[in-house]
Design a protein with these regions (language model features):
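GST-like fold's C-terminal all-alpha helical module
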Residues: 108, 112-219
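Acidic/histidine-enriched, glycine/proline-rich intrinsically disordered or flexible terminal extensions
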Residues: 223-249
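Acidic carboxylate-rich catalytic motifs and surrounding loops in phosphoryl-/glycosyl-chemistry enzymes
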Residues: 54, 221-224
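Short, solvent-exposed turn/loop segments enriched in Gly/Ser/Thr/Pro and often Arg
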Residues: 30, 177, 223-226
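A generic membrane alpha-helix/interface feature
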Residues: 65, 197, 231-233
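GST-like domain detector, emphasizing the conserved glutathione-binding G-site
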Residues: 3, 9-144, 148, 237, ...
Length: 249
């Protein structure tokens, strides 16, 4: 009998089953290291093909003109087979989890994985904007808010990791979609304070495990570097430093 932290399929089996049907996927977002990171890590992990496009390139006009035409005026949007548009980052991640073999088969385990995922989503604000767009005094203000609150959250995340006897992920030796979201947020936190994870060996072990996943390792090595955080944040794309944000540079 399976425990609630076990899955009847091995990671390779789940990935191969999930990716046997390959829809056309286009992920539309901005020049930010934020809500599109987990989806891209998951797709790279599964070896799936997708296109990542800036909003202004996909829609052919500035976001300020396109926003009213997009569902709820929000990005990211995942376009499936040129027709179906999925918005809300959580909905995108859960859909992709079924395609990438990172959604548990067991309903109870699925609920527990989703609980961890939702907990990571609570780190989005102020973390994502603080790293990506805030500058000057505004950056310092929101950085202080995050650094004051995050240690308590991190302690709880570490405790959840330590409940897994098999590790190194939240629910054993296999990564689920919650693990990719946790990695993204933890890695952003280290941009604000490099040693912020160091008090918890379980978290450091988790980070190393995600970074060495096939596909993810290559993605992390090739994705745009973020620089000048807090002063004039930019992503280096094809060797060119481009300001972060919702506008084409």
């Amino acid at each position: 009998m399976l425990r609630a932290d076990q899955d009847q399929y091995e990671p390779k089996d789940r990935k191969e089953r999930a990716m046997s049907e390959k829809p056309k996927l286009e992920l539309i977002y901005f020049n930010l290291r934020a809500l599109a990171e987990s989806p891209q890590m998951m797709m790279r992990y599964a070896g799936g093909e997708y296109r990542y496009e800036m909003a202004w390139d996909y829609y052919g006009k500035p976001w300020s003109e396109t926003k009213l035409e997009v569902a709820f005026g929000q990005l990211p949007v995942l376009v499936v087979n040129d027709t179906v548009h999925i918005w809300q980052s959580g909905a995108i991640v859960r859909y992709l989890a079924k395609l990438t073999g990172t959604m548990p088969e067991d309903p109870l385990l699925e609920a527990r994985v989703d609980a961890v995922f939702e907990q990571t989503q609570e780190l989005c604000a102020p973390l994502n904007p603080t790293v990506n767009v805030k500058i000057g005094d505004d950056h310092l203000k929101f950085k202080a808010i995050f650094l004051n609150s995050f240690p308590g959250s991190l302690k709880n995340f570490a405790r959840q990791l330590e409940l897994s006897d098999e590790g190194p992920y939240f629910f054993g030796s296999k990564p689920y979609y919650c693990d990719f979201s946790a990695y993204h947020h933890f890695s952003l936190a280290t941009i604000l304070q490099q040693d912020i994870l160091n008090a918890y060996p379980s978290v450091l072990n988790f980070m190393a495990a995600v970074e060495n996943l096939s596909g993810v390792k290559e993605y992390l090595a090739s994705r745009p570097e973020i620089i000048d955080v807090g002063t004039a944040p930019k992503l280096i794309i094809d060797g060119i430093a481009k300001p972060t944000g919702t506008k084409s540079s």
